[in-house]
Amino acid sequence: MNQVPSPIDFAALLDMLGGDKQIVASLLSKFAEELTSDLAASEQAVVDGDAEALRQIAHRIKGTSANLHALMLSAAARELEQACTEADASLMTIKQQVMSDQARLVRETIESWRTDS
């Protein structure tokens, strides 16, 4: 049976942080807050057609999510960043939605992890 991978590799994240669940919880909580703000800003940047603002947001999400082992979100943000570099408005809209969908999964995973930990 195929199992869907978690949006966050908690084992790798815990290993990187010496198994300290309090640090992981703190980092993920801050990330979830920033992600909510960044996603709202990214939606506004799409509406405004502001490719540079959207690229900066995608770049920030790409790096932070990679550091926190949320690799599918990081990949989606990387694709959005590339679309912004190409200034392809329709592709930016699509990639922003893909990134938002991945971010929703990450936020749900963080909330579930908080409840279970």
Describe the role of every protein-language-model region.
Residues 1-117:
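Two-component system phosphorelay core
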